[in-house]
């Protein structure tokens, strides 16, 4: 007969970061006797919930989706942008078999490498550093003919800001001693996603056959001429740079956008044998057409960075080991504690139950800062007393949702409501011999005013988040923890070996 579970409860205080600055800090201002007592008597510390520690670019504030994905996965979950940037830094990019294979085929036949992509530092669809790295990879592997077909931004960047990006790539090619920008066109044409095929055809014909409305000796001259025609970056018309460059049989074509939605239409024109959206004057027999990421499972093009599937996330691993689990949150954060915490899976795992508590129907949550936290807590206390679950994962939305309103007094009340709720959970756990981990997904409520502008600060922060152990074990919190370490910590408390897929390590160590 199995022993009665004494639940391990993971309490996620959404948007509840830590700052040592007391001004405009709703946590500091709140009357929170339970939280203060736990920090004084229980093992506690801080863990990171932002930037590269959660798979985002350096200095990027965390968010709820990324936070819960990392919490549940037990490993840092890298976004495509970050995966590519990290691979470039680590050197893995230059050994990527999909990229090197395409370049080597072209080089072996004495053919050209064509690089397509949004030339921008916007970081939404692409990043110019990735295009620089691709040019370097091609040169390192012996390509003599390297051509960049640059799509100009002006949408995720200022409308006329392409000059510095063009200068960067010109300097890159000069340093490599080979390669050049072969064409310019605005993203309005090359990156359509609304089936405006006349726009896409302009980009396709420019790249494949050097068919252009305008020509220029250099990319900078082409840009200046476009500005003189009153075309901002996004709308620059097809411009051939220097001698005509065509995509010939045996050439390799590599599309360096990492975001899929605006890369699909042009890619279809290059790779679909029965393409009918516009009449292609010519379809070269390319050695390879590569997407930096998978643009669509229906587009027959290899991806240099294939989609990463998350196996053995916490919920799945608990189910495999016969453990029961409860996920509970109010409406605002229900998807986070279920779908995102489960690594992008909609369906519950075996032995998993879910409780959704409706969020209050108010215009803004500063009008009801306690939100539905008391009702959520009622159900958690009930579940603890029943002792049906090995693990309970709860999200409290207050810190984030009230923090987003920018109303300081309401944020203080939200923190005080949370303190009462946490106290009720801790009391219930003590009666049954259970344990809890208290943490957050990212910061917010600890900074309610922008120190530069003096205006309300309604966004997330890059501050670390608390990590508190509640229980009887003689442990301490190690330095350097991140959100991805939380799931391995839970498995350690449950007496389970972590799966190989979880690269995080326990935050709790023997005292």
From Swiss-Prot:
Annotated catalytic residues: 64
Binding site for Mn(2+) 2: 14, 64, 441-442
UniProt GO BP: glucose catabolic process; glycolytic process
Gene Ontology molecular function terms on file: manganese ion binding; phosphoglycerate mutase activity
Catalytic reaction annotation: (2R)-2-phosphoglycerate = (2R)-3-phosphoglycerate
Cofactor(s) the protein needs: Mn(2+)
UniProt binding sites for substrate: 125, 155-156, 187, 193, 259-262, 333
Family matches, as CDD domains: iPGM
Pathway: Carbohydrate degradation; glycolysis; pyruvate from D-glyceraldehyde 3-phosphate: step 3/5
Annotated EC: 5.4.2.12
Cellular component annotations (GO), alphabetically ordered: cytosol
Cofactor note: Binds 2 manganese ions per subunit.
Signal peptide (residue range): none
Top-level taxonomic group: Bacteria
SUPFAM superfamilies with a match to the protein in the record: 2,3-Bisphosphoglycerate-independent phosphoglycerate mutase, substrate-binding domain (SSF64158), Alkaline phosphatase-like (SSF53649)
InterPro entries: Alkaline_phosphatase_core_sf, BPG-indep_PGM_N, Metalloenzyme, PGAM_B_sf, Pgm_bpd_ind
Annotated positions binding Mn(2+) 1: 400, 404, 460
Keywords: Glycolysis, Isomerase, Manganese, Metal-binding
Matching HAMAP family: GpmI (MF_01038)
PANTHER family (UniProt xref): 2,3-BISPHOSPHOGLYCERATE-INDEPENDENT PHOSPHOGLYCERATE MUTASE
Annotated function: Catalyzes the interconversion of 2-phosphoglycerate and 3-phosphoglycerate.
Subunit record text: Monomer.
Family from the record: Belongs to the BPG-independent phosphoglycerate mutase family.
Name of the protein: 2,3-bisphosphoglycerate-independent phosphoglycerate mutase
């Amino acid at each position: 007969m199995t022993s009665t579970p004494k639940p391990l409860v993971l309490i996620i205080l959404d948007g509840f970061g830590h700052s040592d600055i007391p001004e405009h800090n709703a946590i500091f201002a709140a009357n929170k006797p339970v939280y203060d007592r736990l920090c004084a008597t229980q093992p506690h510390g801080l863990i990171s919930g932002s930037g590269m520690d959660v798979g985002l670019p350096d200095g990027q504030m965390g968010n709820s989706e990324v936070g819960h994905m990392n919490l549940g996965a037990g490993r840092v979950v890298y976004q495509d942008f970050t995966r590519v940037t990290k691979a470039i830094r680590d050197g893995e990019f230059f050994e990527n078999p999909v990229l090197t294979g395409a370049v080597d085929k072209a080089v072996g036949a004495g053919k050209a490498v064509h690089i397509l992509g949004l030339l921008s530092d916007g970081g939404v669809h692409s990043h110019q550093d990735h295009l620089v790295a691709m040019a370097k990879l091609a040169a390192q592997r012996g390509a003599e003919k390297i051509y960049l077909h640059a799509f100009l931004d002006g949408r995720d960047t200022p409308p006329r800001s392409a000059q510095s990006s063009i200068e960067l790539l010109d300097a890159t090619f000069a340093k490599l001693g080979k390669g050049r920008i072969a064409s310019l066109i605005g993203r309005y044409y090359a990156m359509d996603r609304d089936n405006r095929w006349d726009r896409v055809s302009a980009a396709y014909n420019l790249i494949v056959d050097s068919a252009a409305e305008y020509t220029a000796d250099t990319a900078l001259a082409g840009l200046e001429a476009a500005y003189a025609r009153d075309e901002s970056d996004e709308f620059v018309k097809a411009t051939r740079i220097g001698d005509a460059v065509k995509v010939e049989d045996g050439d390799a074509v590599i599309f360096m956008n990492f975001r899929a939605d605006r890369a699909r239409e042009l890619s279809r024109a290059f790779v679909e044998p029965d393409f009918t959206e516009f009449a292609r004057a010519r379809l070269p027999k390319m050695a390879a057409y590569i997407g930096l990421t998978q643009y669509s499972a229906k587009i027959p093009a290899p991806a240099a960075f294939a989609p990463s599937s998350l196996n053995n996330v916490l919920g799945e691993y608990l189910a495999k080991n016969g453990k029961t689990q409860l996920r509970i949150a109010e409406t605002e954060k229900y998807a986070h504690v279920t779908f995102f915490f489960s690594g992008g899976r909609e369906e519950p795992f075996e032995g998993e139950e879910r409780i959704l508590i409706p969020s209050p129907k108010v215009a803004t949550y500063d009008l009801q800062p306690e939100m539905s936290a008391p009702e959520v807590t009622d159900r958690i206390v009930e579940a603890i007393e029943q002792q049906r679950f090995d693990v309970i994962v709860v999200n409290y939305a207050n810190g984030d949702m009230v923090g987003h309103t920018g109303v300081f007094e309401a944020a203080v009340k939200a923190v005080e409501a949370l303190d009462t709720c946490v106290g009720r959970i801790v009391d219930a756990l003590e009666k049954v011999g259970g344990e809890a981990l208290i943490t957050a997904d990212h910061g917010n409520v600890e900074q309610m005013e922008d120190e530069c502008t003096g205006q309300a600060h309604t966004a997330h922060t890059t501050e670390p988040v608390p990590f508190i152990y509640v229980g009887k074990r003689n442990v301490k919190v190690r330095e350097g923890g991140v959100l991805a370490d939380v799931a391995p910590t839970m498995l350690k408390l449950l007496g389970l070996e972590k799966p190989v897929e979880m690269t995080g390590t326990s935050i709790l160590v023997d005292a």
